[in-house]
Amino acid sequence: VKIGRLFFKGKKVLFSVKNRKIMTRIQNHMTKIVRILVFAFLMLIPVCGVAQDKIKIACIGNSITEGADNYPTPLARMLGNQYEVGNFGKWGHTLLRKGDHPYMSTDAFINAQKFQPNVVIIKLGTNDSKPENWKYKDEFETDLEYMISTFQKCGSKPKIIICRCIPASNNLYGIRNEIIKDEIYPIQKKVARKFHLKLVDLYSPLEHKVDSTCYVWDNVHLNKSGSLILAEHIYKAITGKKAPKLENAFVN
């Protein structure tokens, strides 16, 4: 019986030693795997960090946003590499859904939502002042609210900024400055207050500059000097800081 017990104990000891060797090997392999995974994770952090740190700005508007010498170009340069500025302007379009060219029926509107912006700049209303569009003026407020609500449903939960329309003078398009100043602006102000949004006054800085210093020949669209003024005011609305002075502001 003693020999049997001794034999049993000896077998148990041998099994235990063998077990320890196996466990040691497993631990060594696991340590190597963990080190590889940690290294891979650390290598991925810088790439992920850049993507996550980009603040996306969606510029919604008409030809003043989309066209030549547009303000999003210098705005992007002012903001720098931490920002991504998307130009979603559409030439000749209206905020009004019953307008002759409604912005909210365009691919640009859909793409702006897919962009998942962190900030949305709404600069629409100039083309709405035309007689054929302003006959639907009673719907301007609800349409502006609809656009705001649509962007607020984006997963990115963007900050929304409304821009007061810039002034216009005598022109061939039927754009009426008195409508922009006396009818559209009060609605923009009312909606901004209702939704607790920032309203950027782009009218006042250009009110006495509807000439060759800031506008092109048609008295509606801006040249580089005028667009630079817009970019500076919108930059301040986004960052709370004064815009930096740039050389070659319109170079992409």
How does the language model describe each region?
Residues 1-60, 64-73, 77-82, 113-118, ...:
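N-terminal secretory targeting modules
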Residues 44, 64, 92, 167, ...:
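Residue-level detector of flexible, active-site-proximal loop/helix-junction positions
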Residues 53-59, 64-142:
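Conserved SGNH/GDSL esterase-like catalytic core that processes O-acyl groups on lipids
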Residues 73, 148, 189:
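Short glycine-/small-residue-rich flexible loop motifs, especially phosphate/cofactor-binding loops
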Residues 84-86, 159, 196-198:
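Conserved beta-strand segments of alpha/beta enzyme cores
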Residues 123-127, 150-182:
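Active-site segments of SGNH/GDSL-like serine hydrolases
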Residues 144-148, 185:
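Generic structural signal for well-ordered alpha-helices
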Residues 166-252:
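Catalytic His-Asp segment of secreted/periplasmic serine-dependent ester chemistry enzymes
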